[in-house]
Amino acid sequence: MKSIIGKKLVRSTIVIIISLFLIVKPAFAALDYTKEDLRESDFSGQDLSGSTFNKTNLRSSNLSNTNLQRVSFFGANLESANLENADLTNAVVDSARLTRANLHNAILEGAFATNTKFEGANIEGADFTDVLLRKDVEDKLCAVAKGTNPVTGRDTRETLYCP
């Protein structure tokens, strides 16, 4: 009799646990902020990997020390945003505006940024390894590139293939 009750209790517990996994959203789920107005928002230190910020206004927002791997910022306004120490590995920042953004020590490895605007951005210590950039943008970045990324150990100028 005790073993039958024990087996039923174990089965019930397993069913409850499986149900919770199917109903409750995990805390690390990617979020969709497409076309939101998030000016001056504070996302610092968060894990936003895989999230979508397409055509989102993030002007003057704090994204420092944030995991932004595989995030899409297509057409987003990141003017004057703080992305210091952010990890943008394999992110899409194509057609985004990063004018006067702080990319100090950011990692952009493998990012797609062909039509991105970087005018006045602080790129000291940023890692641009394998970033897809237009040649004219690359030349402008080389004019101000300096520093070494403390995480990857790569020199900013070398990751941009500066002469």
Q: Which sequence ranges carry the predicted segments?
A:
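Tandem repeat scaffolds
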Residues: 2-11, 15-163
